[in-house]
């Protein structure tokens, strides 16, 4: 697992993290053991390294670096999950995570059957949800609108532009770079 060793003041480098090997913990009631399969690396993670108040608490020195993740349940002491379930949550930069399914930054959810697991970290994850709610609830494009998307080359911006077109925008202009 990778734990935060020091807080960066500029660019993030490997020196800010420490590779630590630990035994897989025994589960307590209500916990599941997840083998992490996929991690999402997002710009917001840089902000989580700063020791400032934000929409989520900062990653503390000595804590596993947080990340949106998809994994497979390998053991369960929670009746809502069984071995083999594919789940999404915030399991962090580690191979195995013992987590309580009802606590944490992101509640643990099963990835619906038929959805590629990696899509839970993109179009059906924070990226897609940010674009969806930003466009549908805030931007509210209507038939014939011209919509400008800043950051259109990024994950969220590219989805936002597509949603604008689906909602009827005549023109979608993207800023990239």
How would you name each of these model-derived features?
Residues 157-158:
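N-terminal Rossmann-fold NAD(P) dinucleotide-binding loop
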Residues 1, 146-147, 172:
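Conserved hydrophobic helix-helix packing surfaces used for dimerization/oligomerization
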Residues 131, 161, 165-166:
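Gly/Ala-rich phosphate-binding loop of Rossmann-like dinucleotide-binding domains
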Residues 165-177:
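Adenosine-nucleotide cofactor-binding segment
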Residues 23-41, 49-93:
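Glycine-rich beta-strand-centered segment in the early N-terminal region that forms part
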Residues 65-72, 79, 83-151:
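NAD(P)H dinucleotide-binding glycine-rich loop of Rossmann-like/cofactor-binding domains
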Residues 12-23:
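Short glycine/threonine/proline-enriched tight-turn/helix- or strand-capping micro-motif at secondary-structure
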């Amino acid at each position: 697992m990778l734990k935060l060793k020091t807080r960066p003041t500029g660019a993030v480098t490997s020196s800010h993290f420490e590779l630590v090997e630990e035994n897989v913990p025994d589960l307590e009631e209500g916990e599941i053991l997840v083998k992490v399969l996929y991690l999402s690396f997002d710009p917001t993670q840089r902000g989580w390294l700063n020791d400032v108040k934000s929409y989520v608490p900062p990653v503390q020195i000595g804590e596993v670096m947080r990340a949106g993740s998809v994994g497979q349940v390998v053991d369960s002491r929670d009746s809502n999950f069984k071995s083999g379930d594919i789940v999404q949550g915030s399991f962090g930069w580690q191979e195995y995570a013992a987590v309580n399914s009802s606590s944490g930054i992101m509640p643990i959810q099963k990835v619906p059957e038929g959805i590629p697991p990696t899509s839970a970290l993109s179009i059906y994850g924070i990226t897609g949800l940010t674009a969806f709610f930003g466009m549908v609830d805030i931007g509210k494009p209507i038939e014939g609108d011209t919509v400008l998307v800043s950051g259109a080359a990024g994950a969220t911006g590219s989805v936002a532009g597509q949603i604008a077109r689906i909602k009827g925008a005549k023109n979608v202009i993207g800023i990239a770079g």
